[in-house]
């Protein structure tokens, strides 16, 4: 596409954080901030002022690429207030290595972001191919092409290794040497834009990278977490890395457990959001998809081009939208008029004994209040307006009355695992070697193999049969909250 001329506006009052106004008065976020760089471990704009980007990550473009288009990204900018979008291009699992045409969807996302004046992350999404060196030559070719096409645009951020993982894949031995070959390819075309490098153990071990940093002034280190699995220990690792002067970008996080499903864990997510805000850490939430998992931002049937109603947002999506809007100084509002049946007027019949609680009012904004509606008390789980208690099983209201709710407040897990892996659990300890002792009587079932991919299979390990509950590789049976269910 024809290159755009980036207009840089000099402010007399420095911005402390990236806002997100796209009005004619303020210009786009890229017009406001221009070329990003790192100073003293902090992401800053062209004026040297600290910047905090907030936005969304796609799911795998080979599976859910229909949600990545100009209209959906524009809606995320205008309605949610995002300042960054991450295009997650899986390398394996049906991604770029098997189907190079998926890079066309990356280009579509990048060019939309440039037109819309937001930042964009080009994500080389390694996952089941746990060692980034497996496809190092392909990575060099890909980033040579991307940096040649888009290196003149300050919008672009390169993420060269999503989640290195596996007990042998460490920063010093595998990840840093890989980065030292890939980054120079980018720098030959693009000397200035930010490069994000993944860290060991599914981009959790930022402390290792902080102790042996790359020799590039504009490198950041990826940190990923899932609110239902990860807590204070990982926050301590981030603080250690920051204390060593390492620049951290939370290029992926979820409200769910580390599997991408389970939850949502909104209280824990809020702790993490506060943590990131206090440290001015930029972030992208996983993920823009309608997949049947709790980390998905959209409900099944959501419009791929944006304009999402309240009914089309999942609990995670509604929560993340509001968190981004808060920092973007966008007044709270419903996404669009809901597609659910009109709730009509508030319950005109005074409850027989509602105590101190008022009747639900569709015109009222609620965040944590308790209301009375249809003979029952309800409490808002997050920000809501004009969403009737009980009208949506995945909605913002939790029943408090004596009668049990007709549907669970969280989406039920799928009866069968999805064929695509989603994000595997990065919270497991290293599984070590497979059980070297053959089972005395495993019957027809093979011994667990850490190199094998499992989705629903039964294996024998440590004298016991185990069945995979979802996609897994290199995660040893027997760890709590993991992907394996004991069968005997």
From Swiss-Prot:
Pfam families: Cellulase (PF00150). GO terms for cellular component: extracellular region. One of its GO terms (biological process) is cellulose catabolic process. The active site is at residues 163, 252. Its EC number is 3.2.1.4. Residues 326-362, 388-451 are annotated as: Disordered. One of its GO terms (molecular function) is cellulase activity. The keyword Hydrolase applies. It catalyses: Endohydrolysis of (1->4)-beta-D-glucosidic linkages in cellulose, lichenin and cereal beta-D-glucans. Residues 417-433 have a biased composition (Acidic residues). Substrate binds at residues 59, 63-64, 90, 125, 226, 258-259, 286, 291-293. Keywords: Carbohydrate metabolism, Cellulose degradation, Glycosidase, Hydrolase, Polysaccharide degradation. It is an enzyme of class 3 (hydrolase). Residues 332-353, 405-416 have a biased composition (Pro residues). SMART domains: ChtBD3. Belongs to the glycosyl hydrolase 5 (cellulase A) family. PANTHER family: ENDO-BETA-1,4-GLUCANASE A, GLYCOSIDE HYDROLASE FAMILY 5 DOMAIN-CONTAINING PROTEIN. This is Endoglucanase A. The lineage of its organism: Bacteria, Bacillati, Bacillota, Bacilli, Bacillales.
């Amino acid at each position: 596409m024809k290159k755009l001329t980036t207009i840089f506006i000099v402010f007399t009052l420095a911005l402390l954080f990236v806002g997100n106004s796209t009005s004619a008065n303020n210009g786009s976020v890229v017009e406001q901030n221009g070329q990003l760089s790192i100073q003293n471990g902090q992401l800053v704009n062209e004026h040297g002022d600290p910047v905090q980007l907030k936005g969304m990550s796609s799911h795998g473009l080979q599976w859910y690429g229909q949600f990545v288009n100009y209209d959906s990204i524009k809606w995320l900018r205008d309605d949610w207030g995002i300042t960054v979008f991450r295009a997650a291009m899986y390398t394996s699992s049906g991604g770029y290595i098997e189907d190079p045409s998926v890079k066309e969807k990356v280009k579509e996302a990048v060019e939309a972001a440039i037109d819309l004046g937001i930042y964009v992350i080009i994500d080389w999404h390694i996952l089941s191919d746990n060692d980034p060196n497996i496809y190092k030559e392909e990575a060099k070719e890909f980033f040579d092409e991307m940096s040649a096409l888009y290196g003149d645009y300050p919008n672009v951020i390169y993420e060269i290794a999503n989640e290195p993982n596996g007990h042998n894949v460490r920063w010093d031995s595998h990840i840093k040497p890989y980065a030292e070959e890939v980054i120079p390819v980018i720098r030959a075309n693009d000397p200035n834009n930010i490069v994000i490098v993944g860290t060991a153990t599914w981009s959790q071990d930022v402390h290792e990278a902080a102790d042996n940093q790359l020799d590039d002034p504009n490198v950041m280190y990826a940190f990923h977490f899932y609110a239902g699995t990860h807590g204070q220990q990982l926050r301590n690792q981030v603080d250690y890395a920051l204390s060593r002067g390492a620049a951290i970008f939370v290029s992926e996080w979820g409200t769910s457990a580390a599997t991408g499903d389970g939850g949502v864990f909104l209280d824990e997510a809020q702790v993490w959001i506060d943590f990131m805000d206090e440290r001015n850490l930029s972030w992208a939430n996983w993920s823009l998809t309608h997949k049947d998992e709790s980390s998905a931002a959209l409900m099944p049937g959501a419009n791929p081009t944006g304009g999402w109603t309240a009914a089309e947002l999942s609990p995670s999506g509604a929560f993340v939208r509001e968190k981004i809007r808060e920092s973007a100084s966008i007044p709270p509002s419903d996404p669009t008029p809901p597609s659910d049946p009109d709730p009509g007027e508030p319950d005109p019949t005074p409850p027989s004994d509602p105590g101190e609680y008022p009747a639900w009012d569709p015109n009222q904004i609620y965040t944590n209040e308790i209301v009375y509606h249809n003979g029952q008390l309800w409490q808002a789980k997050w920000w809501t307006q004009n969403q009737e208690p009980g009208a949506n099983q995945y909605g913002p209201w939790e029943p408090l009355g004596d009668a049990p709710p007709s549907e669970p407040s969280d989406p039920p897990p799928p009866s069968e695992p999805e064929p695509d892996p989603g994000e595997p659990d990065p919270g497991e300890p290293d599984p070590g070697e497979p059980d070297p002792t053959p089972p005395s009587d495993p019957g027809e079932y093979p011994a667990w193999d850490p190199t094998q991919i499992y989705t629903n299979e039964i294996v024998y390990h440590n004298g016991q049969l185990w069945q995979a509950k979802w996609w897994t590789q290199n995660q040893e049976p027997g760890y709590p909250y993991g992907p394996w269910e004991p069968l005997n």
